[in-house]
């Protein structure tokens, strides 16, 4: 089954070809440099650039897969959640291509794509498993059963983990996206430099707004000279301290969920799953709790179309297809 996946939910334009269990191509065109000067994604700029990039990205994905579009069995496209304008570009292209080739259209939930991205690697988790989705826009803990059976145990009540990293990086004078910059600096810093707050809720929900506010006040309540000296001399330590605060909260929630459910396999997916400390801590959690932990390769942590193509193929095999009237759902949930 040859499936073309298209992903454009935020600021990455992506296309990939999935062929019966194999990723034949996975092309991603990032707009990070374009949005860096604004400190975050500008929706209008993102959608405009998706329009410019969608055709060459799809052409490249087909070329790298050595695949003829006429041989495709289906087109899978992200229809939510995400930025409305960005979603429209990718889904409209997917709908037109499916209609032109007379093949099924499969609408894919971006979050479902992340959940099953763990199956793109060698460590495919047994079902059921717990899945921690951590990205710029979402932080959710999900119990995953058989295909398409998802039970959300908890989600963020305010900022997502990736969003918190971006905002704290901005306070530190770092670039966008901020998560990778914080992670890089943190590797050389002392996580015990400052004890920033950890919000541990009674259920499995998350909250990172308190941490973000604490960092803001920690810097704001200093003279300009003192703040400049602090950021100059202890940037690595500050990054390590905030990274530790975020990772502690995430790992603690997963540990409690493992104990509450008895599930023996955990997956960590999404852009923040690329965070080196989170990957190490989750592996350590697996050793401590006697559970298997799966984390996708870095290429599949970030937004990509391979996960969309694979999820689409999975739905097509189950007899699911979307009508040509499928519309975008920016606030779609699992």
Curated annotation (Swiss-Prot):
Catalytic activity reported: L-threonylcarbamoyladenylate + adenosine(37) in tRNA = N(6)-L-threonylcarbamoyladenosine(37) in tRNA + AMP + H(+)
Main EC class the enzyme belongs to: transferase
GO-annotated cellular components: cytoplasm
Family annotation (PANTHER family): TRNA N6-ADENOSINE THREONYLCARBAMOYLTRANSFERASE, TRNA N6-ADENOSINE THREONYLCARBAMOYLTRANSFERASE, MITOCHONDRIAL
Keyword vocabulary terms for this entry: Acyltransferase, Cytoplasm, Iron, Metal-binding, Transferase, tRNA processing
Needed co-factor(s): Fe(2+)
Protein source organism: Salinibacter ruber (strain DSM 13855 / M31)
Protein name (Swiss-Prot/TrEMBL): tRNA N6-adenosine threonylcarbamoyltransferase
Intracellular or extracellular location(s): Cytoplasm
Cofactor binding note: Binds 1 Fe(2+) ion per subunit.
Record GO terms (molecular function): iron ion binding; N(6)-L-threonylcarbamoyladenine synthase activity
Function of the protein: Required for the formation of a threonylcarbamoyl group on adenosine at position 37 (t(6)A37) in tRNAs that read codons beginning with adenine. Is involved in the transfer of the threonylcarbamoyl moiety of threonylcarbamoyl-AMP (TC-AMP) to the N6 group of A37, together with TsaE and TsaB. TsaD likely plays a direct catalytic role in this reaction.
EC number: 2.3.1.234
Domain of life: Bacteria
Family: Belongs to the KAE1 / TsaD family.
UniProt-listed InterPro entries: ATPase_NBD, Gcp-like_dom, KAE1/TsaD, Peptidase_M22_CS, TsaD
A Pfam family reported for this protein in Swiss-Prot or TrEMBL: TsaD
Annotated Gene3D superfamilies: 3.30.420.40
Biological process according to GO: tRNA threonylcarbamoyladenosine modification
UniProt: substrate binding residues: 133-137, 166, 179, 183, 275
Cited SUPFAM superfamilies: Actin-like ATPase domain (SSF53067)
